[in-house]
Amino acid sequence: MASPELAGLYQQVILDHSKLRKGSGLVDGGVAESHQLNPTCGDEITLRLHLVDGTGTGAGASDSTGGSTGEPIIERLSWDGQGCSISMASASLLSELAPGLTPTELTERIALFREMMRSRGAGVEDDEPLGDAAVLESVSKYIARVKCAMLAWVAAEDTVQQVTAGRA
């Protein structure tokens, strides 16, 4: 459990991201797009996945031998949305985390984030791969707000599935 000082810092990070909205503003040229709506509260987001060729030396683009996997690299997630501070902060934190990852690595982060959101405040063993998005762990205590935090992550998961299925 976080100390009161740490909890205050986490809350400030969430508020800052809900105002700054990193990655906000849809950018043309994405390879996949997903629109998600939380009918319970009206939060909504449209998210675009932007990839670049994975033959370079981007973060995470190497296999166990140090060679390139050839998997594309996420250049950015661009998004537009409206909703509560939690959903907007979560989208901002996700768009900060994703660049440099492969779609496979993003899928792993989404699964870890989902596990954290289902933990009801218990967290996950290792939240380091989530970067600053780990501050949203406190939201998992409030079941009604988990959908708010998950909205952008579900949209990102959908875009990765579109690319993987060859629909993009």
Q: Where in this protein do the model-derived segments appear?
A:
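Basic/polar, acidic-poor N-terminal "presequence/leader" segments
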Residues: 1-12, 47, 72, 76-77, ...
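C-terminal binding/interaction regions
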Residues: 2-19, 23, 101-168
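Structured beta-strand/loop patches that form or line metal/cofactor-binding pockets in enzymes
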Residues: 20-55, 74-81
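Functionally engaged cysteine thiol sites
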Residues: 41, 84, 148
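Intrinsically disordered, low-complexity terminal tails and inter-domain linkers enriched
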Residues: 52-73
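Glycine-rich, flexible loop segments associated with nucleotide phosphate handling
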Residues: 69-78, 127-131
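Short, thiol/selenol-centered motifs that function as redox-active sites or metal-ligating centers
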Residues: 82-88
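Alpha-helical support elements that line or immediately flank enzyme active sites
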Residues: 90-102
